[in-house]
Swiss-Prot record:
Lineage: Eukaryota, Metazoa, Chordata, Craniata, Vertebrata
Protein's UniProt name: UPF0235 protein C15orf40 homolog
Keywords from the UniProt entry: Phosphoprotein
NCBIfam families the UniProt entry points to: DUF167 family protein
Gene3D superfamilies: YggU-like (3.30.1200.10)
Family the UniProt entry places it in: Belongs to the UPF0235 family.
HAMAP family: UPF0235
Residues where Phosphoserine is found: S89
Length: 126
């Protein structure tokens, strides 16, 4: 009996290890299709656009546009394209059109490490 119990716990441990590794990367990840995604906590109605904080769950971004008729969403994509040195068409809102918790997808070929480094640099400017 002990062998069976040990065998099942090994199987569980092996499946848990890969699952816990990706969330440790933080708010910037790669989706199954290979695109880089960024979890955003939007703060619309601010005086100026800025990356306010980087947490393990999301990147806090202040948006200088009102949260009505998608203005803040468009401004968020424009601002992130400027910060990340990408074309505006390469930064698209994937989820969260009417929520403060958003997911932005980057269609350009870049790595999560490069994106995180640029976001950290922008956050330190404030």
């Amino acid at each position: 009996m002990p062998k069976k119990a040990g065998a099942t716990s090994k199987g569980k441990n092996q499946t848990k290890e890969p699952e816990t590794a990706p969330p440790a990367a933080g708010p910037v990840a790669t989706d199954p299709k290979g695109f880089v995604t960024i979890a955003i906590h939007a703060k619309p109605g601010s005086r100026q656009n800025a990356v306010t904080d980087l947490s393990t769950e999301a990147v806090g971004v202040a948006i200088a546009a009102p949260p009505s008729e998608g203005e803040a969403n468009a401004e968020l994509c424009r601002y992130l394209s400027k910060v990340l040195d990408l074309r505006k068409s390469d930064v698209v809102l994937d989820k969260g059109g009417k929520s403060r918790e958003k997911v932005v997808k980057l269609l350009a070929s870049t790595t999560p490490e490069e994106v995180l480094e640029k976001l950290k640099t922008e956050a330190e400017k404030k």
